């Protein structure tokens, strides 16, 4: 009896750009041999809006509302880096109280970022329930932001060169403390529900492994880097704001797989609560903005300084000139290193505004770690990277 040899041609499959688990408008051109991935080519750019070019024709005050749209799951980080760049270039000092307020806002944003990563990631690996839980917690963070800045998810427009737009309202600190008391047991609940679930463990352990050397060579940052055994966190490395005055640990894992990245993010949420509690306790009095920086920015006094207009950008006229020179400023966002390269030429507009987003750099390793995996693992690996296409494409 003669055996007939069957040879299958590789199949080319388009995943996205409108698939719910693609985390935005990402398109993957995947070449499959049966169930195995032979090659993968990510196609990006569907959400490109020219954010860097827009910055070159906007003053800093005018540009702050735009930046929430880079990484629209965590807008505060974008605002922080947008004001940090001119601050460092012009050597403007930020008052202590403003630093503490900023740290609290950034850590709330880190928790919100990791929550919005956790829900869709669990949905990607087949667990639907946590997706509904995370919005219950995020809703409380939205309430805190709304009380402080007037806006909930994006366009908080809260950070300013030399400080923040307005001081925290009366009772906000107690409300934030209540959130911390409520949220910590919820993280334990997530752990109980997810971490030792045998189905979840089989889906993520040993999948999408990135070694320590690969993580460094590919320029990864954030939980992608720390999940591969590199103890690198810009809050410790760059000593920005008042993180040095607070007691907290850098969370890292050595396995480098999807499960390690999950553990890093879960533990970072706990550390963020720890940081927020300390910052609330240690927050000093004093001004919430650098009055000298404000004087540089402010136009003539008018009714725009009135209480009901306090959030409107008209309050400060865009007369602040960015000094000649260039500078690279970075901070640790929920996804990794978010940086701005700014070039000023003694004008109200920056001459060059280059955005270095964490998820754009983290996404580039995807084709490398997808080679040889099963097609069902693509979603788990992509989900573990934590990308937002607004930030990737800008």
UniProtKB/Swiss-Prot annotation:
PROSITE patterns (UniProt xref): COMPLEX1_49K
Modifications made to the protein after synthesis: The initiator methionine has been seen to be kept and removed.
Subcellular location: Cellular thylakoid membrane
Xref: Pfam families: Complex1_49kDa
Topology of this chain in the membrane: Peripheral membrane protein
GO biological process: photosynthesis, light reaction
Top-rank taxon: Bacteria
Family stated for the protein in its record: Belongs to the complex I 49 kDa subunit family.
Protein name stated in the entry: NAD(P)H-quinone oxidoreductase subunit H
The organism of origin for this protein: Synechocystis sp. (strain ATCC 27184 / PCC 6803 / Kazusa)
């Amino acid at each position: 009896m003669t055996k007939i040899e069957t040879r299958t041609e590789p199949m080319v499959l388009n995943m996205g750009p409108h698939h719910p688990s693609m985390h935005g408008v990402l398109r993957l051109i995947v070449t499959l041999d049966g169930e195995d991935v032979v090659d993968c080519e990510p196609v990006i750019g569907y959400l490109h809006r020219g954010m860097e070019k827009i910055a070159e024709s906007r003053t800093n005050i005018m540009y702050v509302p735009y930046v929430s749209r880079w990484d629209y799951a965590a807008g505060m980080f974008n605002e922080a880096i947008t004001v940090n760049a001119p601050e460092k270039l012009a050597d403007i000092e930020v008052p202590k109280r403003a630093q503490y307020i900023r740290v609290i806002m950034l850590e709330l944003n880190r928790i919100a970022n990791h929550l919005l990563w956790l829900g869709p990631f669990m949905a990607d690996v087949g667990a639907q329930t946590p997706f509904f839980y995370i919005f219950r917690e995020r809703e409380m963070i939205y309430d805190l932001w709304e009380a402080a800045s007037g806006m909930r998810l994006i366009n908080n427009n809260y950070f300013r060169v030399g400080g923040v737009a307005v001081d925290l309202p009366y009772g906000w600190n107690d409300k934030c403390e209540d959130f911390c008391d409520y949220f910590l047991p919820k993280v334990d609940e997530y752990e109980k529900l997810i971490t030792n679930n045998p189905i979840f463990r089989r889906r993520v352990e040993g999948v999408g492994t990135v070694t320590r050397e690969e993580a460094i060579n590919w320029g990864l940052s954030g939980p992608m880097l720390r999940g591969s055994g590199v103890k690198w966190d810009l809050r410790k490395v760059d000593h920005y704001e008042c993180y040095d005055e607070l007691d907290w640990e850098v969370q890292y894992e050595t396995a480098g797989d999807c499960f390690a990245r999950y553990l890093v993010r879960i533990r970072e949420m706990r550390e963020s609560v720890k940081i927020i509690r300390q910052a609330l306790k240690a927050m000093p009095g004093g001004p919430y903005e650098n009055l000298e920086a404000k004087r540089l920015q402010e136009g003539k006094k008018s009714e725009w300084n009135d209480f009901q207009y306090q959030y409107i950008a008209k309050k400060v006229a865009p007369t602040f000139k960015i000094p000649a020179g260039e500078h690279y400023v970075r901070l640790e966002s929920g996804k990794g290193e978010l940086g701005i390269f700014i070039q000023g030429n003694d004008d109200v507009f920056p001459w060059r505004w280059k955005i270095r987003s964490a998820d754009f750099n983290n996404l580039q390793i995807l084709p490398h770690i997808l080679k040889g995996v099963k097609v069902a693992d693509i979603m788990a690996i992509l989900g573990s990277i934590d990308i937002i296409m607004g930030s990737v494409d800008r």
